[in-house]
């Protein structure tokens, strides 16, 4: 199964790219994790943040194919590790690839949220999108290792 992490934002700093790559490469069992970067909409002095969000939403929806879609959203469902492992198992058995949507500074466009089959909250805290990429890769690896009986997850 291919998991595409579709995230608003640009290149990751070295520490984030290294962390993301480490966990993405550890995934096995026919799972690949691919990063799709959506350019930030124009923001700044005099710019309309709604217009930036609209641009990001259009680009994100255009990047989607016929795959399961899960939106990362603070108002989504929070899963502990065993629950995430069950979700991953369900996604694996669905037969479709998976897209995880991560918004930019203003979150996800309402149309992206509407397109999502599920909403997942990593935490009630707000994280920088670069850190979210690393957290997602690690949590997916942790859930996969739990499904495989691998000793990485020891809770």
From Swiss-Prot:
Entry's EC annotation: 2.1.1.177
A Pfam family hit: SPOUT_MTase
Biological role stated in the UniProt entry: Specifically methylates the pseudouridine at position 1915 (m3Psi1915) in 23S rRNA.
Catalytic activity: pseudouridine(1915) in 23S rRNA + S-adenosyl-L-methionine = N(3)-methylpseudouridine(1915) in 23S rRNA + S-adenosyl-L-homocysteine + H(+)
Binding site for S-adenosyl-L-methionine: 72, 103, 122-127
Species the sequence originates in: Alkalilimnicola ehrlichii (strain ATCC BAA-1101 / DSM 17681 / MLHE-1)
Protein keywords: Cytoplasm, Methyltransferase, rRNA processing, S-adenosyl-L-methionine, Transferase
Family that this chain belongs to: Belongs to the RNA methyltransferase RlmH family.
Subunit structure, interactors included: Homodimer.
GO molecular-function term, one example from the UniProt record: rRNA (pseudouridine-N3-)-methyltransferase activity
Gene Ontology CC entries for this record: cytoplasm
Gene3D superfamilies: 3.40.1280.10
Subcellular location(s) of the protein: Cytoplasm
Protein name, UniProt field: Ribosomal RNA large subunit methyltransferase H
